[in-house]
């Protein structure tokens, strides 16, 4: 959910810098419009950059893609994609795209199908796997201690030791 991505991003940012200022904006339109407005995404990303943002997490379908594409036209600003490896789905964002927060839907669905077939699926809310896309052109720019921190953080989130404040 958008709220989950938002809370997770803020929790992660504050875990490395408790004094960080995170700017957040949600599309003001109906849900049917919120994910299909790349112009709004681009304009909102530009406003955040003008307010000093140096990283834009562009979540929200085509709206988020518009944000990523805007960030790619700016210098000294980075972006993070969402849902899949947006290096592949939004090539125009490559100049700024550090990584993407990926919803690993295919393995999660395969696991659910397997459990349903074996009779071990109990129903209820199921949270699938998530991951981080490769750093691609930024691979050599990310220091090893930061990469190690990301691996440890993912393990902590998966095990439940680390909480984001959303849904737990």
How does the language model describe each region?
Residues 1-168:
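A residue-level marker of the well-folded mature domains of exported/periplasmic proteins
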């Amino acid at each position: 959910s958008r709220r989950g991505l938002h809370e997770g991003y803020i929790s992660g940012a504050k875990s490395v810098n408790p004094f960080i200022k995170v700017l957040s904006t949600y599309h003001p339109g109906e849900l049917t419009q919120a994910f299909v407005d790349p112009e709004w995404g681009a304009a909102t990303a530009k406003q955040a950059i003008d307010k000093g943002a140096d990283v834009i997490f562009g979540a929200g379908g085509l709206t988020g893609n518009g944000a990523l594409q805007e960030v790619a036209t700016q210098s000294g600003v980075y972006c993070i994609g969402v849902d899949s490896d947006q290096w592949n789905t939004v090539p125009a964002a490559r100049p700024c795209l550090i990584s993407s927060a990926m919803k690993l839907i295919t393995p999660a669905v395969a696991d659910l199908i397997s459990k349903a077939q074996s009779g071990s699926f109990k129903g209820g809310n199921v949270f699938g796997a998530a991951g981080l896309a490769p750093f691609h052109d930024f691979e050599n720019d990310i220091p090893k201690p930061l990469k190690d921190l990301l691996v440890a953080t993912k393990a902590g989130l998966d095990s439940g030791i680390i909480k984001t404040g959303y849904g737990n």
